[in-house]
Regions:
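Donor nucleotide-sugar binding/catalytic pocket of nucleotide-sugar-dependent glycosyltransferases
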Residues: 139-176
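A charged, aromatic-enriched C-terminal amphipathic alpha-helix characteristic of glycosyltransferases
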Residues: 314, 325-360
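Glycosyltransferase donor-sugar binding loop
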Residues: 215-229, 247
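Acidic donor-binding loop of glycosyltransferase active sites
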Residues: 256-273, 287
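Conserved acidic donor-binding segment of nucleotide-sugar-dependent glycosyltransferases
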Residues: 303-314, 320-327
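Conserved donor-binding/catalytic core segment of Leloir-type glycosyltransferases
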Residues: 181-200, 206-218
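Nucleotide-activated donor-binding/catalytic signature segment of Leloir-type glycosyltransferases, i.e.
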Residues: 228-252
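Nucleotide-sugar-dependent
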Residues: 265-280, 292-294, 298-300
Length: 372
């Protein structure tokens, strides 16, 4: 049983009177493809907040008044994605999305509730050229409009003038059904899970993948990128060792795929996201992780002895083969350490302290620039 299941109270339970609880007005309020948003909502509820959607519909139903209560908080995640629309694997500027983004920026400017902006990415995924540079400018704008910024990677606190808060473990939250752990065999199963997109450089990985090692790739991807990957698999005759399961995985399927993995590979480029969500699904559950040496993963490797790093994709075959030769003795169990760092109770403590700081902050003392 996880620490959260044993020790945490109901995420929506609080002894304070309902009407006295401050509100977190959250955008987005739902995300059907990622449990992160639901976990965040449960965290806010567990530390004493009512969590409500920040949306046009909600504002019209009486939520507008809540914008002007200094004790309330506006929490934004991935707001920089609003001005863009993804089409055939590429994110491009959208007029309707830009107008919606401008609407949310206006709410930040006119309201008295504190604004907390969670920075997840250096740039919007799948943008190139002008759109990529624009997305970075948009992130910079929202950073300036926000009263507080949060990052899940401690090394980026100074760069983004942000507070570090741990990213919660997906498997250590109240109500999370445990996945069935498999018995690890004599031959390790390497896995690459989640969305199949160019920023993960899976094509470069397949170009050097050892033909004697088993690899499972699973997740939703665009037809164009999948065609590229299948072409490499066929060209290098990897069909017998590489399984490409190109479809959306439910939460239960993703969790079970993690549990079935012996080694998880995180090849994301350093200039895309600050942290990989898959890391927080895997750490403490998967015996080994291989990752590109991004700043967060370098710090993770200092804490967890089952995290192995590479700087260049050309180094990957040597690492993969060395694991195969040393398996299963090389596997590690880092569950307790992962709970100490990123578990539900650790997150409740850190988020509670941070939100107390936010509530004590005087909104009218912050100058809000409107140009960028």
């Amino acid at each position: 049983m996880t620490q959260a299941a044993k020790n945490a109270r109901n995420p929506i339970d609080d002894t304070a009177p309902e009407r006295s609880r401050p509100r977190v007005m959250m955008c987005p309020f739902t995300n059907p493809t990622n449990r992160y948003i639901q976990i965040q909502k449960d965290l806010y509820s567990s530390i004493g907040y009512d969590v409500v959607p920040l949306s046009i519909k909600g504002l019209l139903k009486g939520g507008l008044f809540q914008l002007f209560k200094p004790g309330n908080i506006l929490a934004f995640h991935w707001l920089e994605y609003r001005p863009f629309k993804r089409d055939k694997g590429t994110a491009r500027l959208s007029l309707t999305g830009t107008l919606l983004f401008a609407f949310y920026c206006t709410l930040m400017l006119i309201g008295r509730a504190k604004v907390v902006y969670f920075i997840h990415d250096h740039a919007v995924h799948d943008t190139v050229g002008f759109n990529r540079r624009l997305s970075m400018r948009i992130i910079a704008l929202v950073r300036r409009l926000a009263d507080f910024r949060v990052v899940h990677a401690p090394d980026f606190q100074a760069q983004y003038n942000a507070q570090y808060l741990p990213h919660p473990l997906y498997w250590d939250v109240p109500g999370q059904a445990p996945a069935t752990l498999k018995k690890h065999g004599e031959r390790p199963l390497f896995s690459l899970l989640g969305v199949i997109r160019p920023y993960k450089q899976i094509d470069a990985l397949l170009d050097v993948w050892p033909s004697e090692c088993v690899l499972s790739i699973a997740g939703h991807g665009t037809q164009a990128y999948l065609a590229t990957l299948n072409e490499i698999i066929d060209k290098r005759a990897l069909r017998s060792v590489v399984q490409l399961d190109a479809r959306f995985l439910s939460d239960a399927e993703f969790a079970q795929s993690i549990a079935d993995s012996d080694v998880l590979i995180l090849p994301h480029t350093a200039d895309s996201m600050l942290v990989s969500g898959a890391f927080f699904e895997a750490i403490g559950r998967v015996p080994l992780l291989i990752s590109r040496a991004t700043p967060f993963m370098v710090s993770a490797a200092r804490k967890f002895d089952n995290v192995m790093l590479f700087d260049d994709i050309a180094e990957l075959p040597r690492i993969v083969r060395s694991i195969g030769e040393s398996w299963p003795a090389i596997g590690r169990n880092s569950g307790n350490l992962a709970i100490d760092e990123f578990g539900w109770n650790a997150c409740r403590r850190r988020y509670g302290q941070f939100f107390e700081t936010v509530e004590g902050h005087r909104r009218d003392s912050v100058e809000k620039p409107v140009v960028w």
